[in-house]
Design a protein with these regions (language model features):
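Asp-based, Mg2+/Mn2+-dependent phosphohydrolase catalytic module
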Residues: 2-16, 130-210
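Asp-based phosphoryl-transfer active-site loop
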Residues: 15-37
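Short, well-ordered beta-to-alpha junction loops that form the rim of enzyme active sites
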Residues: 25, 108-112, 169
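Short catalytic/ligand-binding loop motif for oxyanion handling, primarily in non-cytosolic enzymes
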Residues: 29-33, 114-117, 174-175, 193-195
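Conserved phosphoryl-transfer catalytic core
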Residues: 35-72
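Substrate-recognition element of Asp-dependent hydrolases with the DxDx(T/V) motif
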Residues: 70, 82-123
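Short, basic/glycine-rich phosphate-binding loops at helix/coil junctions
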Residues: 70-78, 130
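Histidine/lysine/aspartate-rich catalytic loop segments that bind and position anionic ligands
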Residues: 109-143
């Protein structure tokens, strides 16, 4: 099923559905504390074990050169059932709904694409990658820069950037995406950084509100 321009949202009648949705991770699909309190400490605590077990491999030698060991430590953690990605309870249902409507969903995060795939590949609600059409990281640009969102729009083949809905918890990212022409909503989850009092973006506390 293809979502066509002008198609109405049958659930709430609010107007046309987006062709694509681009999601941030921390504070949007996933609690900020998961990254800060689980992923980062796990990588810190297991770097020695990882290097001892894999030091002779070409991958680890490349990792050391390119400073990307962290993602591979996490990969081992997921494979060994020591890590499990965490998403908010409203996320799986929304992803399934958007997928059924033919809306393509992408992730844009400062974390590497490997780290993104790991989080969504093994979550507290199972493997959610089947609902995701692609992943963007900072190779496309800084998330607070307008050009990054222009690059994403061009990469997705979307001629009208406002056909893309971007969800983030970071005000500066919302400003950049809006300046690039995207539709924007801000995720206002528990524990997220407070927004400026004079901000004018639509805010949501759950994907069920979209």
């Amino acid at each position: 099923m293809v979502v066509k321009e002008g198609m109405n949202n049958s659930d709430n009648g609010t107007g046309p559905l987006p062709r694509c949705i681009v999601l941030d991770i921390e504070g949007t699909t996933t609690p900020i504390i998961f990254v800060a309190d689980v992923l980062f400490p796990y990588a810190h605590d297991n770097v020695g074990r990882h290097l001892s077990a894999t030091y002779e491999t070409a991958e680890t030698h490349d990792d050391i050169k390119l400073l990307r060991t962290q993602g591979h430590i996490w990969r081992t953690g997921y494979e060994n059932n020591e890590l499990e990605g965490v998403v908010y309870g409203d996320v799986p249902e929304a992803l399934e709904k958007w997928h059924a409507l033919g809306i393509k969903v992408y992730i844009y995060s400062s974390g590497s694409r490997l780290a993104q795939r790991l989080i969504f590949g093994k979550t507290n609600y199972g493997d959610l990658r089947k609902y995701l059409s692609g992943f963007f990281d900072t190779k496309v640009g800084n998330k607070k820069e307008i050009r990054s969102y222009i690059e994403i729009s061009e990469s997705l083949g979307v001629n009208k950037p406002f056909d893309i809905l971007f969800l983030t918890d970071v005000f500066q990212e919302a400003v950049a995406a809006k300046a690039a022409g995207l539709e924007v909503m801000i995720s206002n989850r528990p524990g997220n950084t407070p927004l400026p009092d004079d901000q004018s973006f639509k805010t949501i506390t759950s994907f069920a509100e979209i």
